């Protein structure tokens, strides 16, 4: 079983030798290390790069534990460089494990308390130094909030480029599993998702145990350690609430009320908002804001949250209430994000009633409104689903993703209708719709 993840490898290949540090971020266990150390490395070697010109530093391995010092990391890499006029490729895995270092000639007592943090050397200093070394191309992976977009933008300025890596998409899932029945494969994907090791596991009980363990042994533990939480009980209950509310409108106050019904004494709205931010920072959930289509403005609350992977969401709920229709909406949201789109939830006022467009999709060169439905069994259901698209009162393209199969077709009122499987497997369908 293998997914070649060509979109990511191609993105890395096109950004070689551009003078920037290439930073692969994403949820832990989504395959960043494999992408870099196996797939990208194979492509480089196939194009003639000698293997001794590829320096790999997996910081999560005991063999390289000594490199978790920011200064020693740089020294280790420079000692391994081949000086023959050809490019060296440096792969540093889990770079956030690197510790900051105080230079020996710096006396903190002579520095104002508010400036002391700047006295330390961090992995950002190491990476920026390596980036400026002749014929050195730097690639790193990071999994948690030490490698956030805002941190990368601040510390690298215009010297770093972030590539967000997601779990296997449905297309990558099919590439790896080679299913004959795509409809059955989609049903399986809506339950188990695309975490690579879960996809590779054929035994459903083992697959379920693995997905459940990720929350307790990896994600919740990481967040507790990173933010120095006294315990992770409230955090785990919040994960449960967000998982059960996937794709539903909510806000911190509603989440607090839901927690209060479970805990009998809920945390404050402020604490809930902070915890939600921690979960987003760990790439477990993504926020979708609401966009007033006719008023052309964002609405503050409520908003929606989607899980990074349907299998993780279902595992958190014990694989009860899988809700295939909601999971399909979640999968389409993730697919749009992975394809580089900005995705909001649309609001359309019709008379005195407020209707929803599942997704308002923005990406150069255009905008697209999308409704998603696993099935529309009656004409009335179909009319209700299409109403907000028809009453948006603008010229942007509209799409209805309905059912599993169904080649793209244009309806009499100009709406592109397509099945979920063709949409997820053929990227050109979205490209053409956005291009108008």
Predicted ranges, named:
Residues 33:
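Walker A/P-loop
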Residues 55-86:
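Short glycine-rich substrate-engagement loop in P-loop NTPases that contacts/grips substrate
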Residues 1-17:
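Pre-Walker A adenine-sensing motif
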Residues 405-436:
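Domain-level recognition of nuclease-like catalytic cores that cleave nucleotide substrates
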Residues 204-366:
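Accessory nucleic acid-recognition modules appended to NTPase machines
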Residues 24:
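Hydrophobic anchor at the beta1->P-loop junction of P-loop NTPases
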Residues 134-135, 143-249, 253:
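Interdomain motor-coupling "hinge/lid" segment immediately C-terminal to the ATP-binding subdomain
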Residues 96-139:
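Conserved Walker B catalytic segment
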């Amino acid at each position: 079983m293998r997914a070649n993840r060509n979109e990511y490898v191609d993105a890395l290949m096109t950004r070689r030798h551009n003078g920037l540090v290439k930073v692969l971020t994403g949820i832990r266990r989504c395959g960043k290390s494999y992408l870099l150390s196996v797939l990208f490395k194979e492509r480089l070697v196939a194009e003639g790069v000698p293997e001794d010109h590829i320096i790999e530093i997996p910081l999560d391995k005991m063999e390289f534990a000594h490199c978790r010092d920011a200064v020693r990391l740089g020294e280790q890499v420079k000692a391994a460089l081949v000086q023959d006029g050809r490019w060296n490729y440096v792969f540093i895995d889990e770079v956030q494990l690197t510790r900051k270092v105080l230079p020996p000639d710096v006396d903190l007592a002579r520095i104002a308390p508010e400036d002391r943090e700047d006295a330390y050397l961090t992995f950002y200093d190491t990476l920026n130094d390596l980036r400026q070394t002749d014929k050195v191309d730097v690639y790193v992976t990071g999994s948690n909030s030490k490698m956030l977009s805002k941190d990368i933008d601040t510390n690298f300025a215009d010297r770093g480029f972030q590539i967000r890596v997601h779990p296997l998409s449905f297309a990558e899932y099919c590439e790896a599993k080679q299913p004959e029945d795509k409809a059955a494969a989609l049903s399986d994907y809506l339950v188990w998702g695309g975490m690579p090791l879960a996809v590779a596991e054929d035994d459903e009980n083992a697959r379920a145990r693995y997905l459940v363990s990720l929350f307790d042994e990896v994600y919740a533990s990481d967040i507790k350690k990173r933010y120095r939480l006294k315990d992770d009980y409230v955090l785990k209950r919040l994960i449960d609430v967000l998982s059960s509310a996937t794709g539903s409108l909510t806000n911190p106050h509603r989440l607090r009320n839901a927690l209060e019904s479970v805990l009998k004494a809920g945390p404050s709205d402020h604490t809930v908002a902070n915890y939600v931010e921690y979960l987003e920072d760990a790439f477990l959930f993504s926020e979708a804001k609401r966009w007033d289509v006719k008023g052309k403005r964002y609405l503050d609350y409520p908003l929606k949250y989607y899980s990074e992977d349907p299998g993780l969401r279902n595992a958190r709920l014990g694989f009860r209430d899988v809700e295939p229709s909601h999971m399909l909406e979640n999968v389409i949201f993730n697919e749009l994000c992975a394809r580089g789109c900005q995705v909001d939830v649309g609001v359309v006022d019709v008379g005195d009633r407020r209707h929803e467009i599942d997704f308002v999709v923005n990406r150069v060169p255009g905008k697209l409104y999308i409704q998603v439905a696993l099935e529309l069994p009656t004409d009335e259901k179909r009319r209700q689903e299409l109403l907000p698209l028809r009453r948006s009162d603008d010229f942007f393209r509209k799409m209805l993703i309905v059912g599993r199969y169904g080649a793209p077709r244009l309806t009499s009122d100009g709406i592109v209708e397509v099945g979920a499987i063709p949409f997820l497997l053929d990227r050109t369908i979205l490209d053409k719709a956005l291009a108008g």
